[in-house]
Amino acid sequence: MAEKKEMKIAEVKGRPMLHWIGKQPLETVKSFPSQLVEKFNIEEAPQVPTFESLKNNWTNLLLHGDNREVLSTLLVNGFQNKVNFVYIDPPFNTGLAYVRKVKLRGTNKKLEGEEMSFDEQIMYENSFLESSFLQFMKDVLVLLSNMLNKDTGLIAVRIDYNYSHYIKVILDEVFSKENFINEITIGRSREAAGSPSKLEVTTESIYLY
């Protein structure tokens, strides 16, 4: 799809502000190459879409790629102020690697010298340096704030106790503390405390702006 190149991002001015080592403002974003991968449930041959044609008809659109690159590309190509509701469930930065089991025909053995059996694949690692995670989250939230409709847009951000206190301050900075609506507390599957001196983790939070 034909794409524009670059656009400037307005500085966020909400307060309070959270500071970390290496914090950088998101000043410009650029467009990344994209292509049609597949279309479903159509009666005619798919036409190669353009961003211009998608502006008024982009429901049921699944975008594959790094979220910052996808959001940047959409913004540069005219999707500012277009979205009414955003829900994100970002990594909680727990330091864990999440794997899936892949059953291989004919064997259940492990490869010699490997800690993980070869029928397990890492789906993603939930591990960032602290400053990298905070910068990643701020960049994503700034991009989303530019996509949300300024009059009717809402965003819901799900996070757990590991970083909820940091994310709340970043949300105040990006969306303004005055636009905070509520914190929704939701139950989660019970997680053993692992120590008599610790409490079980039973809830997560959704911040609504």
List PLM regions with ranges.
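DnaQ-like (DEDDh/DEDDy) 3′-5′ exonuclease domain used for proofreading
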Residues: 1-143, 151-152
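Short, solvent-exposed loop/turn segments at secondary-structure junctions
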Residues: 68-70, 92-93, 162-164, 189-191
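RNase H-like polynucleotidyl transferase catalytic core
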Residues: 183-193
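Conserved Class I SAM-dependent methyltransferase catalytic core
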Residues: 122-185
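Polar, glycine-rich mid-to-C-terminal structural blocks
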Residues: 189, 196-208
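Hydrophobic or amphipathic alpha-helical targeting/insertion segments
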Residues: 81-97, 104-105, 147, 154, ...
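A short acidic (Asp/Glu
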Residues: 74, 166-170, 194-195
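Short acidic-hydrophobic sequence patches enriched in Asp/Glu that either
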Residues: 116, 163, 176, 198-201
